[in-house]
Swiss-Prot record:
Residues 135-156 are annotated as: Disordered. This is SsrA-binding protein. Gene3D superfamilies: 2.40.280.10. Keywords: Cytoplasm, RNA-binding. Belongs to the SmpB family. It holds the Pfam family SmpB. It comes from Legionella pneumophila (strain Lens).
Amino acid sequence: MTTKKQPDSTIALNRKAGFDYFIEDQYEAGLVLEGWEVKSLRAGKINLSDSHVIIKYGEAFLLGAQIQPLPTASTHFIPDPVRTRKLLMNKKELNHLIGSVERQGYTIVPLSLYWKKNKIKIKIALAKGKKEHDKRDTIKDREWQRDRSRIMKKNT
């Protein structure tokens, strides 16, 4: 008996977050979406690179995420691709995020968007911003890892 291979549940990744920030803690949150947004996400029409999370009135909101509407969207409704979307989280997790952001100067950035049991979830991270020299160190390390693997491959 063969098992069915699960399709990749990842919708979008924010590769820029790992380069621009030191990732500390990761959390999973739900998203409040409209119908046209879910259809666009199924088609993979989202950009998370310039987005971030803010906390207002004890609730978390996703800002700057662009979900492009499909051309078949309704004509009597004007979709807003960059609207603010509410995140659904436990109160305990939310309180921890509020404390870290206000007291310790952390930023909350989205890492990925994915399907989980027919629901769309977003992985967010508590992060500290990198300075320019930290980014250069990251590039140097990445290039050294690439060169080292080439050398090892050539010698074997």
